[in-house]
A protein has these predicted regions:
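Short, well-structured N-terminal submotif of metal-dependent ribonuclease cores
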Residues: 1-34, 43-57
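Active-site neighborhoods of divalent-metal-dependent phosphate/nucleic-acid chemistry enzymes
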Residues: 21, 63-107
């Protein structure tokens, strides 16, 4: 299995104990790639007492590098989607671009990624 980028929506299911077969497989195989914004989103939504364990868990995963060229591509993706009448937030464009940068599968439940996938080479699946 190639790299698998995982959106916050799938992590929410994972941490709530809901079925996430593709994520479970990617974790077992060590192919999960974590967009930096997803770290912030996860940590902003948990109890302070859970933070150290969550940081340790997330810290063991591969963090997607986001060099300057990545952010240029994020802006270009947002612009291209806007030209098609599709509003995409910067965080969502960043997550999608993390997957596009590595030709990785993106796991998400967020419908915006389906619209991005129809307009780009983004490979998308549910968790």
């Amino acid at each position: 299995m190639n790299a698998v980028v995982v959106d916050t929506s799938v992590w929410i299911d994972f941490f709530a104990g809901r079925a996430t077969e593709r994520l479970d497989d990617a974790l077992r195989l060590g192919t999960v790639v974590l967009p930096p914004i997803v770290v912030a989103e996860i940590l902003s939504g948990i109890r302070t007492s859970d933070r150290p364990a969550m940081i340790a868990f997330l810290g063991d995963l591969e963090l997607a590098e986001a060099p300057f060229s990545h952010w240029i591509a994020v802006g270009e993706l947002r612009s291209a989607m806007s030209a098609r009448g599709i509003a995409v937030s910067t965080p969502d464009a960043h997550v999608a671009q993390c997957a596009l940068d590595r030709d990785a599968l993106l796991l998400s439940h967020d419908s915006v990624f389906g619209r991005i996938a129809k307009a780009t080479s983004l490979r998308l699946a549910r968790g």
